[in-house]
Amino acid sequence: GFRMDVIDMIAKEPRAKILVNGPHLHEYLHEMNRQTWRNRDFLTVGEAWSASPEDARQYSDEQREELSMVFQFGHLWADRQVGGEKWEQRPLDVAQLKQALYACQTTMATHGWNSLFWSNHDLPRAVSRFGATGQYRELSAKMLAIALHGLKGTPFVYQGEEIGMTDCPVATIDQVNDVEARTIYRQLRAQGDDAGTAMQKINIFNRDNARTPMQWTAKQHAGFTTGKPWLAI
């Protein structure tokens, strides 16, 4: 298959201040479909942060000949502050999460197709975000897997999710590789946060959480390498 990054931005018109869902977006995708993957047996999935369930149905309706499906992220706002920054977390609103998942299932019940996911290379680990990392880590991982695989759509299992890998909090900014997190840290310090408070916020949505080496064994460096890994485990 073929994943398309931020596909909802390919028709942006900056002068008109249109950055997503530009007027020619679906026209471009239809042309791309006809000229490249049409009549070929592979999957196409587009990343579309701006997509509503209705938008996702347009992208993935077979009759429109655009994409197989898109990643749309409505369910991942259930623990975020509306209009806030990405590190401004709030307690998980389970009702909102259920409503978002239900909307996707019903909107694409007959036309279009769902992608199913909890996490990716830019998001925190699902168990740390939606479950528990201590005594109930294994049960949390199983619960999230059952919830995901019980829905209609194509499931995407991010590496490490199948064994319940968790976030890897760090103590200082020197331990962070994620360039976005380092930039946000400087901004938080400039706004008056002390180092400890800034790191608490960074650890919530630091993209390094999803980019630590895959854990294969209980040996040093989780059996991933005999050398020095790029991130701590």
For the regions a protein language model found, what residue spans apply to each?
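Active-site and adjacent substrate-binding regions of carbohydrate-active enzymes
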Residues: 1-233
